[in-house]
């Protein structure tokens, strides 16, 4: 069993759906978790396809919720966005960008390949300070309510297995292979250093 709690980050594009669903589940399981997005702005589905509602990352979940409630309560209730923002508000005040975080993690999960690329690029561009390893794992998670829940449970299972292992470095590769087989999809994995 690991001597200290596993420090986990989950990163998606806007820190709204996939990363926050995982944040919610991991937190309920008692894990040390933070969640982030990587884009320059938060984009939510709008009333029409290809016309997202765009917010700055400094906008709180409550402000987004109230804005969408005023704009079209029925639409944003029907598509689940108000539910998601309500859940998010109970977890933390607002979305955060990974590139602005200075905290160190043991494992960072990303929810799609372009987010993985951004996270790895950001970590590699930072000046190394402690040479502490951080495992960056990508699992493509569909950006739907159901996809986010399924992805969050898979991330949770991996974290619980890692938390129980005697040596995370030795057991991670084998664990990822087992989880890939179970999930029916492959993961990207690399190690970066702080």
From Swiss-Prot:
Matching Pfam families: Ssu72
MF annotations from Gene Ontology: RNA polymerase II CTD heptapeptide repeat phosphatase activity
Lineage: Eukaryota, Metazoa, Chordata, Craniata, Vertebrata
Function per UniProt: Protein phosphatase that catalyzes the dephosphorylation of the C-terminal domain of RNA polymerase II. Plays a role in RNA processing and termination.
SUPFAM superfamilies, alphabetized: Phosphotyrosine protein phosphatases I
GO BP terms in the entry: mRNA processing; termination of RNA polymerase II transcription
Keywords tagged on the record: Hydrolase, mRNA processing, Nucleus, Protein phosphatase
Reactions listed under catalytic activity: O-phospho-L-seryl-[protein] + H2O = L-seryl-[protein] + phosphate; O-phospho-L-threonyl-[protein] + H2O = L-threonyl-[protein] + phosphate
Family: Belongs to the SSU72 phosphatase family.
Assigned EC number: 3.1.3.16
Gene Ontology cellular component annotations, sorted alphabetically: mRNA cleavage and polyadenylation specificity factor complex
InterPro entries listed in its UniProt record: Ptyr_pPase_sf, RNA_pol_II_suA
Keyword Nucleus: yes
Annotated compartments: Nucleus
Protein name listed in UniProt: RNA polymerase II subunit A C-terminal domain phosphatase SSU72 like protein 6
Protein's organism: Homo sapiens
PANTHER family (alphabetical): RNA POLYMERASE II SUBUNIT A C-TERMINAL DOMAIN PHOSPHATASE
């Amino acid at each position: 069993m690991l001597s200290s709690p596993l420090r986990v980050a989950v990163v998606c594009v806007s820190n709204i759906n996939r990363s926050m669903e995982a944040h919610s589940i991991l937190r309920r399981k008692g894990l040390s978790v933070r969640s982030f997005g990587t884009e320059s702005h938060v984009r939510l589905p709008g009333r029409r396809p290809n016309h997202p509602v765009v917010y700055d990352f400094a906008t709180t979940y409550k402000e987004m919720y109230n804005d969408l409630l005023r704009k079209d309560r029925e639409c944003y209730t029907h598509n689940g966005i108000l539910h998601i923002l309500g859940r998010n508000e109970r977890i933390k005040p607002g979305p955060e960008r990974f590139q602005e975080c200075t905290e160190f993690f043991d494992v960072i999960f990303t929810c799609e390949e372009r987010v993985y690329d951004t996270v790895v690029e950001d970590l590699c561009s930072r000046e190394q300070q402690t040479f502490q390893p951080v495992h960056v794992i990508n699992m493509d998670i569909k950006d739907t309510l159901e996809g986010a829940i399924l992805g969050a449970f898979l991330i949770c299972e991996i974290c619980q297995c890692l938390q129980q292992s005697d040596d995370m470095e030795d057991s991670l590769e084998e664990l990822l292979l087992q989880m890939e087989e179970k999930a029916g999809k492959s993961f990207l994995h690399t190690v970066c250093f702080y």
